[in-house]
Amino acid sequence: MNERDYRLDFCRGLALILIFIDHVPGNPLSLWTLRKWAFCDAAEVFVLISGISSYLAYGSKLDKLGFGGCCTAVARRLTRIYGAHLLLFLSAALFVRLASAYFVRVDYVDFLQVKHLFADPRHYVPAALTLSYLPKYLDILPLYLILLATAPAIIFLVKRDPWLALIVSALVYTMVRMTGFNLSAGHDGLGWNFNPFAWQFLYTIGVVVGHFSKVGFKADSLHYRYQWAWLTLAGGFAIFALLAAAPWSGTEESRALFSLYLWPAEKTFLSPLRVANVVALLYLFAFFVPKQAKFFSSRAASLFLACGRNSLPVYGVGVVLSCAGYVALSENDATNMTSVAVNVIGILSLFTLAYVLDWRRKNLRIVEASTPSNYAIALVRRFVG
């Protein structure tokens, strides 16, 4: 029986669509994404899910191949992600350069923060290659590169003592928040928008969740004994975050009061509010939605599942499309028609890309599993049955 947890692919796919929407400045649809209704946004969902997925993907490799074999498997994945980052960097930079040359309303090169690259390529090209130059919107993959590079060590520790792994991660997180230590983004005196030394805490939480999803909890564990208490706590915090952050008309005064002490929950050093909120939301989702719920077999869900299974190309294309969407909105005065077109075309493009990649992967598997004599039969069975 296939025991794949479709919730992971669905949440990752949904997060990628939300990231595209949020990355288009002035996009009216972003008023309805997670970042407007909670302390966290799609980035936290993506990192937490990535931690869970990393354990599920490499935990068994650590057992079978040892630490060295696990590192080798991770290194292969890192190579692909690094290549994708460089391709995305080049594509986005060239796109905004062409847009700035053709249009005059907005300096799109300055918007993406790549003006330094074109002004001094001899310095900034090597900086980009070493991840010491990170323009706007091009910082999630470098974060993921660093987090994934630490995955073998984190998984190794989690398998021996998950609580010790969390304590060590929390100590690093606390020290970074106290000292303000960060890596340089290489321009304008800025640091990384996603400080990896802070965001590793959320990633480690994901790895620990992945561990317990495989080994389970003891019947008398705190998880089962106080399950309804955890559910109440998660639900209560999610409601509190909604009331504090939601942009409802007439709640401006209450939001202003909350903002004095809580909001906006800063992102670079990963505010504890963001951690608590995303963990609460995913706990509620996991509690109420079975991992193979019938909903996941629907056509609508299948589109998000496909995006989740093809997260790297979907994210990269989504960033370029968000730049194109910003150009379209800026050059057409952000009319309602333009806003609808930007979102519909962008989201449908990502769904189509994910669907085509899924279709290609499935048919490659048919070819690999079939001899030339029975390939046609296998293909017919797949589409008929």
List the model feature ranges, each with a label:
Residues 1-385:
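Alpha-helical transmembrane segments and their immediate juxtamembrane cytosolic regions
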